[in-house]
Amino acid sequence: MGYKISIDAMGGDHGLNTTIPAALEAVKKDSNLQIVLVGDHHKIKRALDRYSKVKKIKLPVLQRIAIHHASETVGMDESPSIAVRKKKDSSMRVAINLVKDRTVDACVSAGNTGALMATSKFVLKTINGVDRPAIVYALPAFNRETKQLSKTYMLDLGANVVCTSEQLFQFAIMGSILAASSKGIAEPRVSLLNIGEEEMKGLDNIKNAAKLLQGCDFINYNGYIEGKYIFDDTTDVIVCDGFVGNVSLKTMEGSLRLIESLIKKTIQESSLLMKIPIVMALPIFKKMKKGMNLDSFNGASLLGLTGIVVKSHGGASANAFETAIYEAIKEIKYNIPKTIQESLEKVL
């Protein structure tokens, strides 16, 4: 089955220097993939020619990449309302329009998160039964019994700072559907992020959401989960409001940088004698770093829309942006918006 994805080629901190090499690698590895690069035609063509020569991309592969001109770009610090009202020919807006027109199956952007969410909601609209879309991200999770690395989906990560219990309930349904499709499990475990595991703890909206989940046969509700267990693979879906989710995600990113800095500092300050066993352990450190590498988990989905939109980290590398493209492909294959719609019709 073939699939086509539009890419906001100008979006993100690094723009074409990230999106073009990522697109080339993705189409080279997946013969079923076609990509439409949206943005300044001249700049994209020039970058495409340069990177295709560096990567030695053959003509049959290049023929699966098209360029769609857009005259404007959305800045990383631009107001979402301005992006929606005034930037109607931005690379972001045009890339999303292609999803609406069914010219492509999904859109991937590393652009301004607020603008992407506002534009996506304005153009694509939400699925019936969904009040607001949510940003969901796959986090690394380690199973202490099997010693295997897995994924836990967490939402919302910043789209909705304040949420009602009904909205948290909707997020749980959407996250459960994504986890079931992505992880290939029939009944994903769903948990609410809270300050404790006891039933009486937490804000009223969280406690009321718990009651809704307990009464829903569709959801395999796993109770509350504390922040210290996020990486323990004790659940498949973690639900929270966008404020808590965004703070949690950025705290995780900062923690990983701290660990990496401490390891480097320890190595640099070690004596020559101590560096010998450290050098011998380098393969272990490299393997550990690979497991902690957030590039392999890049690609946050905007769940609850009638079309597929995947948000890459703004400062993502080419490898990380490529991962976001594969996340979009996965959602295309499982037709996530349609599955969410059908499930909500049964539950609500």
UniProtKB/Swiss-Prot annotation:
Where this protein primarily resides, as one coarse class?
cytoplasm
Gene3D superfamilies with a match to the protein in the record: Isopropylmalate Dehydrogenase
Catalytic activity as recorded in UniProt: a fatty acyl-[ACP] + phosphate = an acyl phosphate + holo-[ACP]
Under which pathway is this protein filed? Answer: Lipid metabolism; phospholipid metabolism
Identify the Pfam families for this entry: FA_synthesis (PF02504)
Return one GO MF term. phosphate:acyl-[acyl carrier protein] acyltransferase activity
Q: Where in the cell is it found?
A: Cytoplasm
Q: What is its EC number?
A: 2.3.1.274
What Gene Ontology biological process does one annotation of this record name? phospholipid biosynthetic process
Keyword Lipid metabolism appears in the UniProt entry: yes
Matching entries from InterPro entries are given as: FA_synthesis, Phospholipid_synth_PlsX-like
The record's keywords, sorted A to Z, are: Cytoplasm, Lipid biosynthesis, Lipid metabolism, Phospholipid biosynthesis, Phospholipid metabolism, Transferase
The protein's matches in SUPFAM superfamilies, at most eight in alphabetical order, are given as: Isocitrate/Isopropylmalate dehydrogenase-like
User: What enzyme category does the UniProt record give?
Assistant: transferase
Q: List the GO terms this entry assigns under cellular component, sorted alphabetically.
A: cytoplasm
Q: Which HAMAP family match?
A: PlsX
The subunit structure is: Homodimer. Probably interacts with PlsY.
| Family named by the database record | Belongs to the PlsX family.
**Its job:** Catalyzes the reversible formation of acyl-phosphate (acyl-PO(4)) from acyl-[acyl-carrier-protein] (acyl-ACP). This enzyme utilizes acyl-ACP as fatty acyl donor, but not acyl-CoA.
Name the UniProt record assigns to this protein: Phosphate acyltransferase
The scientific name of the source species is: Francisella tularensis subsp. holarctica (strain LVS)
